[in-house]
C-alpha cells in the first residue's frame, strides 16, 4: 500500500481519523526507513500522526519494525543507562519516569 493511503486513513480530522493496524504501522515504518516516501509525504504523515495522537499499538509496531533495521546496543552491565521517553507536551500528565529513574540510580 502506498504511503498516501496511510496518510488518508489518519488525516481525516479528529472524529473520522482511524488508528493504523499493527501490520499497517509496520508497513509505514518500512516505507519511511527504506526511503520510499518523499519529504513532503513524511512530513504529512508525521503531522497527521501528531494531530491524531499515536496509539500504543501503533508505537509498538513502529518500534518492532524499526528494530529490524538497527543493530542492538552493547552496553556494559555496570553502566547505569536510563532511557527517557520524549514528551510532546500534549498530555497534561505528571512525568514520573525521570524522577523514578533518578531514585532508582
Which stretches of residues belong to each language-model region?
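Acidic, glycine/proline-rich low-complexity segments that act as flexible tails and inter-domain linkers
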Residues: 1-96, 104
Amino acid at each position: 500500500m502506498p504511503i498516501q493511503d496511510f496518510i488518508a486513513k489518519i488525516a481525516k480530522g479528529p472524529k473520522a481519523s482511524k488508528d493504523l493496524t499493527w501490520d499497517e504501522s509496520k508497513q509505514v515504518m518500512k516505507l519511511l526507513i527504506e526511503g520510499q516516501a518523499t519529504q513532503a509525504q513524511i512530513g504529512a504523515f508525521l503531522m497527521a500522526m501528531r494531530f491524531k495522537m499515536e496509539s500504543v499499538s501503533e508505537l509498538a509496531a513502529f518500534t518492532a519494525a524499526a528494530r529490524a533495521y538497527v543493530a542492538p546496543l552493547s552496553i556494559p552491565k555496570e553502566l547505569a543507562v536510563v532511557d527517557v521517553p520524549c514528551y510532546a507536551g500534549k498530555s497534561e500528565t505528571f512525568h514520573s519516569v525521570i524522577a523514578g529513574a533518578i531514585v532508582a540510580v
